[in-house]
Amino acid sequence: DRLCPGINADRAFQCLAKEIMESMLNQFSRTELLLGKENMERLADARVAVFGIGGVGGYTVEALARSGVGTLDLVDDDKVCLTNINRQIIATRSTVGKYKVDVAKDRILDINPHAVVHTYKTFYMPNTADQFDFSQYDYVVDAIDTVTGKIQLVEQANACGVPIISSMGAGNKLDPSAFEVADIYKTSVCPLAKVMRRELKKRRIRHLKVVYSKEQPLEPIDDMAISCREHCICPPGAVRKCTERRAIPGSTAFVPSVVGLIIAGEVVKDLTVNRKEKALKQPETTATGGQE
């Protein structure tokens, strides 16, 4: 009645739906000025899975939500730690001890109440991979930090024909301008990228879009007290404690955040403007259906 006085319930519902749509369009209007209405609708219909909601993945999720992506799947079994505050957008004094996926979900819904958010308190590895149906995803983001998990993620995405982008090493670096988007086989310098190239080659995976840095990794100060390896301050119930880690990389607020934002930009472009360009560039096929 408030919206459309004097009309029936069905018409009132239509008016309410229109008001919601108008508020949504207004919320993302600045993005629509660049992408257009059709692409904004594509983003609203898209489902993106982000594996790893830390320094990189947290910023990716934030940017995707602010870009209007309609459905987000968040995968991470970790809790926010005091040591995350220096670099993770989800980490504040008030969120320490909370599950990262829960904090990220609250942020997303505060940004866009109409978003659909699925959370998984799961450490993605080969033994947990069957929990995820990749056929539901329009895009997959790899922001996890274990080689075994990253390889499995790439294999699973490739097997389902789902686009994937992978973050290479962001720790022990100070130059955010040194990061580039490239195919994994065209990377250099980054130690993690080197391992990934070797392992993907073994598995005959020929392509993988990554974000990597040409900056030589710095050597962190070996101080047991600073690194928490002597007296871990991880919250109760944390899965991977500092005392159990071989090494803890140094980090800043301005490096992993840039990686996460670059990844989000690639996802948005691939789901919208790049998608259209690829369709226009599709090669003609022969009468038998094969490519020339």
Q: For each predicted feature, which ranges?
A:
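Glycine-rich phosphate/adenylate-binding loop
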Residues: E22, F132-Q136, I144, G149, ...
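Conserved N-terminal Rossmann-fold NAD(P)-binding element of oxidoreductases
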Residues: F51-G52, V75
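Targeting/processing segments of secretory and organellar proteins
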Residues: C4, R11-A12
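Hydrophobic/small residue at the entry helix of a nucleotide-binding pocket
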Residues: V56
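Conserved SAM/SAH-binding loop
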Residues: K121-T128
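N-terminal charged helix/coil linker that caps or initiates catalytic domains
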Residues: M21-A49
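Conserved S-adenosyl-L-methionine
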Residues: R66-T71
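Glycine-rich phosphate-binding loop and adjoining beta1-alpha1-beta2 segment
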Residues: V75-N112
